[in-house]
Amino acid sequence: DQDCLPGWSFYEGHCYKVFNVKKTWEDAEKFCQKQSNGKHLATIEWLGKANFVAELVTLMKLETHVWIGLRVEDKRQQCSSHWTDGSAVSYENVVHNTKCFGLDQKTGYRTWVALRCELAYHFICMSRVPR
């Protein structure tokens, strides 16, 4: 629909597809990129998109977490976010190897959960609508 490739779903100028295979976070991102130019693991920047993605994933009946395109790049660096008192957020308290994020199956895929990047889960790719 809306010029997405067959099997992909349209929402707000992008196409999305949940893949029924399990990969590590890094392999899932590489897989998405190979689908064609401009594809990556899905990003979720607002509630409407979060709800759309949750519904799309729920339809697959996967029963596992699902990778999204969020990862802490370097736990030694401070995040660009800040606490309300202005101090920088650091990830020193994050469990080692827990720097990749997925949609939490237990909440109907409506919240994010920090996961070990080397574990294999299903994943959702997104791309801009082809012109």
From Swiss-Prot:
Question: Which family does the record assign?
Answer: Belongs to the snaclec family.
Oligomeric form and interacting partners: Heterodimer; disulfide-linked.
Name a Pfam family for this protein: Lectin_C
Which keywords label this protein?
Disulfide bond, Hemostasis impairing toxin, Secreted, Toxin
* Name of the protein this chain belongs to: Snaclec A13
Record-annotated disulphide pairs: C4-C15, C32-C125, C100-C117
Give the species this sequence originates from. Answer: Macrovipera lebetinus
One GO cellular-component annotation of the UniProt record comes to: extracellular region
Record InterPro entries? C-type_lectin-like, C-type_lectin-like/link_sf, CTDL_fold, Snaclec
